[in-house]
Amino acid sequence: MFVSFTVAKYSGRNILFGFLSMAIFRILFFLKNYGVVFSKLMGSGKNGTFDIEPDLKQWAYMWVWKSEEHYENFEKKSWVMKYIRRFSTEKFTLFLKPLQSHGLWDGKNPFETNEKENFGDNETIVVLTRASIRIHKAADFWRNVPAIAKNFAQHEGFLYSIGVGEMPFFKQATLSVWQNETFMKAFAYRRKEHSVVIQKTRSQQWYSEELFARFRLIGHTGNVPVSISDL
């Protein structure tokens, strides 16, 4: 299994093409699949943060592929990539290998793997968390979770994160990159504010569906953030 996560930024008159990509890419993949087994086209929060205000200049495209070869063929030949290269001002792609995943996304676990691998002591780890928020719990979610997400950057071992969503307000996700698993776990399980919110999501049943996945970063291309450019 091979996963690509692309972030593309559009500016000026081309901002409209970022917005239109949400519909156009669905049509293009319907016409030719290129070996995609799971696809998510998502907007992002303001400046890429986990914010209720959208950032119309930045869009994220996540695809799960049958193999790396299928992605390479897509990269070279697809109209989707030609579109991104033509209209975006900058873009980067992270290449990921799922190692651990539990939960559901649209009724399935797209990152489920039978491989049993652990992360090395100093190996970069990429984490994706996503949830479908119950309508009557949305206010509770937006009062609590964004503040926690903003604490990412203040925590030791943090490298990068982006808040994204496939449906405004109700279907949200965060992708974050950490120096290693130890730093990630320290934030997720030992930081008091984060633990309290996690307990609320469960006891108050904020989500109708959720998923948590960990990936190995196996490569990247494009204008990657400086914090992860040397990985």
Per-segment meaning from a language model:
Residues 1-59, 68-74, 86-173, 183-190, ...:
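Short S/T/G/P-rich N-terminal loop/turn motif that feeds into the first structured element of a domain
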Residues 79-85, 195-196:
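A common structural junction motif
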Residues 186-187, 191-209:
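Extended hydrophobic/aromatic segments used for targeting, binding, or gating
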